[in-house]
Amino acid sequence: MSAALSFSASASEYEDGDVIVVLRPAEVSGGTVASSAFRAASFAASEGAWVKETYPELSESGSGLYTVIHSDTRDAKEFAEELKNNPEVLAASPNYRVYATTTPTETTVNATDTWGLFSIDAPSVWDTSTGSRNIYVAVIDTGIDYSNPDLADNINFAYSTGTDTHGHGTHVAGIIGAYGNNGVGVAGVNWRVQLIGVRALADNGGGTIADVINGINYVTDLIANKGVNIKAVNMSFETYISLVPSHDNFVKDPFWRALKDLDVLNKAVIVVAAGNYSQTVGQPTTKKQGNMIPGAGYYVYPASFEGIDNMITVGALNTDGSLANFSNKGANIAAPGVSILSTYLQSRTSCVKADGVSLHTISGTSMAAPFVSGAAALLASIKPDLTAYQLKRAILGGSRASSSEQVEASSGESIFNLSDAYDYQKTYAGNATLMPATPPTNTEYSDYTAHAVISKPSYYEEYKNGDGGSDSSSGGGGGGCNAGSGFFAVGIFAPFVMYVKRRKINI
């Protein structure tokens, strides 16, 4: 590593003045997009703010309205807390920044980097299935490089929303579903699967909660309104915010509510990286750490969310089965996350091998999560009628107790094993006690009523049509293979430009 990224002096944990708000359903029925926009504008004006973006389709059933409003004079965090006391508001939060969860280290590609597939005993399950073209996995990330020949046959171009110019999303996608048995590159957990790249993070690997909510709503719409058979949603990113984990705080948080709207469909397992700062999921930080953790009293999200029944948090393992020193502790499960070889940007010519496939070796909980996402899709290819909750139960129920004192003593994660998950699925499928189809109904979150899902996602159609353009950033791109940048996808970056509905807005 010869260089480090330069950080913006003005960068903070959230976008200045931005608050994501979920308004209560309007009292009148039959609201239109125009009336939703008017209501958002009226609300913002009443608070001395203005509308930065709306998601009007959420109001089509009269169940609520997502919007981002901006104040030129108030701190976003204080403003959000004030808005939570407004009777019109269901949820409010600052527009926190999020980052791809890759460690600031890179290693040289070598043949042993496929160790992860053997560690989870994937080959023993490949004897039964190598995947299915009827199964989809959504990757909410930086996009997927359409030109990588080891991914192209498994990318669903109709639903994917933007190509990758950073590298993180492409690497994650390869772990899930690089095309297998084709004589080039690497193999993913699935050799046959349909990958949907949902671009929510920018060229520098960073984004905001509003960007992520856009991605979640897009995936929710594909499942609920278009019938797309998505069995896993991979979310390999993290942010540290001061939201204390509790029922009352979560139900008032827009990020949690968007995830819950996806969760209650019970169609897709939501797989989340635990984070890379040696913290504990659900526990407060004790001090400032680098540019990611502002100080004491912060929590890693989305990994610390509770009440998302179909979510699995994933820590990272070393090759010896111990927990990686960078991995956050307290995840549901741990999977290979150190020195993982996978697909990368074709534009990084120094990464392109003799067979024409760009490959790179990276470490992080970002790499651990897609092993689990890929496994959920592979298990679904064997038994397609499994619900998300049944897939989660198979994955966790079939995990192995760690033989590593480091893992057991420090965090208690079980070790993910695909073969054992498959055995659990075969043994207990149909057992209403050990593999129930639906989550329990007696929890403190059971009374949550889902909001309507969008039917016209905000900016993704523009990416697909080539009208939206690429995000641009002054923060620098992803590292890797003589890229010339330093840390890979971690840090606080300068504000970037996002294209939304052909309107360029600085966020």
What are these regions (language model features)?
Residues I140, L151, A187, A316-S366:
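Catalytic-core environment of secreted peptidases
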Residues F7-T107:
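Primarily auto-inhibitory N-terminal propeptides
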Residues P56-S63, E81-Y136, I144, N148-D150, ...:
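Protease zymogen maturation seam
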Residues D127, S132-R133, A200-I308, D320-S322, ...:
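Substrate-binding/access-modulating region of protease and related hydrolase catalytic domains
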Residues S124-N156, G162-D211, K226-A232, G307-N310, ...:
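Subtilisin-like serine protease catalytic core
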Residues V19-V21, T67, A91-S93, Y136-I140, ...:
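Structural recognition of the beta-strand scaffold that forms the well-ordered cores
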Residues K226-F237, A268, N310-T313, S381-G469:
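C-terminal subdomain of the subtilisin-like protease fold in secreted/lumenal serine endopeptidases
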